[in-house]
């Protein structure tokens, strides 16, 4: 089994879907390792736009089998709703190629209700979650009281565990805007529908051990990782290389490439430190031209300049063998482009390749920038590297040098599926 892993290297929304879509055309197996329906990306396949949340985007290829792995949390209604939406747009037979590990955890509507209550309780210190219940679901998993997908098939165990979960949250918060018996009734129907989708993950991989090309699709991104991200303003799963290996029990020696997807500037949804954020005309321009709205929440994304400190940190943890630089065309109309190259902490310490663990300290860093000339010409739809403006090529090559020679192998030049430069 030869494995390619695609990972977000910033705060998510980097455009992982397009490279995954491209690579999935040759893949025989595509897997999600972490997260739930809080993730979101858009793929333009032909003339049709597809939104993905919990499902692997390998479903756009009719030759690709898809697995939602053990490290994920699955909101069952969203799983079926998303499948139906894909098939309604022409992806016939998608359901027959979508499988869920029996060791994944179930994200209930109950978790969404609790998510809102927990965020409300934080007041001005809100994390800025998607409100999908992901955090409470992972909390239940870590506390050993969660419900696994495989347990849905055992009606007695499932109902007992869900009622116990509900009773625990009621004891904590009081009366909830949630009816546990209604949810149990809904799952009587879901139980029958889920039977062909639920698999023993180890047996599944043994069946597909001769897969010539396995693609692992990362969700969220390294800076949202529970351990390595800007804690506590993170998601609740391991979104980096280590999380993918563990959740899908990959043999590390089978990994042939690790692709880091990075936007040509930086964005973030929700709260938390963002050193290179531009609360000015430049930030507004990036937001408007880049159409920076979250696929899952619809919220405006915060925008700022490319941050090499964050990317060096991300590279040190995920060990990218190549990069996919996305949305280069959004920078076409800037006279000059800034790149963050170092931070200075309040105590005077200068950082170039790591970030402080304390989010409060990261919020207070002074950012050092270099200024590069813009190219002031259209790169939309460019397919060959040599056809890019000279200053655009210099921008890309500067990033490569500053990252120690990690090659930028793919460059996104527009929203369409084929708006991509592939460098050999």
UniProtKB/Swiss-Prot annotation:
One of its GO terms (cellular component) is cytoplasm. Mg(2+) binds at residues 13, 40. The keyword Metal-binding applies. The active site is at 13 (proton acceptor), 41 (proton donor). Pathway: Purine metabolism; AMP biosynthesis via de novo pathway; AMP from IMP: step 1/2. The keyword Ligase applies. Binds 1 Mg(2+) ion per subunit. Plays an important role in the de novo pathway and in the salvage pathway of purine nucleotide biosynthesis. Catalyzes the first committed step in the biosynthesis of AMP from IMP. This is Adenylosuccinate synthetase. It comes from Emericella nidulans (strain FGSC A4 / ATCC 38163 / CBS 112.46 / NRRL 194 / M139).
């Amino acid at each position: 089994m030869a494995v390619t892993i695609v990972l977000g290297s910033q705060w998510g929304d980097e455009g992982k879907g397009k490279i995954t879509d491209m690579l999935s055309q040759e893949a025989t197996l595509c897997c999600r390792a972490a997260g739930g329906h809080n993730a979101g990306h858009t793929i333009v396949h032909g003339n049709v736009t597809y939104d993905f949340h919990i499902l692997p985007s390998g479903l756009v290829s009719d030759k690709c089998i898809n697995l939602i792995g053990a490290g994920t949390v699955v909101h069952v209604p969203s799983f079926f709703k998303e499948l139906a939406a894909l098939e309604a747009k022409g992806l016939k037979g998608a359901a027959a190629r979508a499988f869920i590990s029996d060791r994944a955890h179930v994200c209930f509507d109950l978790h969404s209700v609790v998510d809102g209550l927990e965020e409300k309780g934080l007041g001005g210190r809100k994390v800025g979650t998607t409100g999908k219940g992901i955090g409470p679901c992972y909390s239940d998993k870590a506390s050993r009281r969660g419900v696994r997908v495989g347990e849905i098939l055992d009606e007695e165990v499932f109902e007992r565990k869900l009622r116990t979960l509900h009773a625990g949250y009621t004891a904590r918060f009081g009366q909830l805007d949630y009816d546990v018996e209604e949810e149990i009734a809904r799952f009587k129907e879901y139980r029958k529908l889920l039977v062909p989708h639920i698999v023993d993950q180890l047996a599944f991989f043994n069946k597909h051990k001769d897969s010539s090309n396995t693609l692992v699709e990362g969700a969220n991104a390294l800076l949202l990782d529970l351990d390595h991200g800007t804690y506590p303003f993170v998601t609740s799963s391991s979104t980096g290389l280590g999380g993918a290996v563990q959740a899908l029990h990959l043999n590390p020696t089978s990994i042939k490439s690790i692709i880091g997807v990075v936007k040509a500037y930086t964005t973030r949804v929700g709260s938390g430190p963002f050193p290179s954020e531009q609360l000015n005309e430049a930030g507004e321009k990036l937001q408007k031209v880049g159409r920076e709205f979250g696929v899952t929440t619809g919220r405006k994304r915060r925008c700022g300049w490319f941050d090499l400190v964050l990317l060096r940190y991300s590279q040190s943890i995920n060990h990218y063998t190549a990069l996919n630089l996305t949305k280069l065309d959004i920078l076409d109309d800037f006279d000059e482009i800034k790149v963050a190259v170092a931070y200075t902490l309040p105590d005077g310490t200068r950082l170039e390749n790591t970030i402080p663990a304390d989010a409060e300290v990261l919020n207070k860093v002074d950012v050092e920038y270099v200024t590069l000339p813009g190219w002031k010409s259209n790169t939309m739809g460019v397919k060959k590297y040599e056809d890019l403006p000279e200053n655009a090529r210099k921008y890309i090559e500067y990033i490569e040098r500053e990252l120690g020679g990690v090659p930028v192998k793919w460059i996104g030049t527009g929203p369409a599926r084929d708006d991509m430069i592939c460098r050999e």
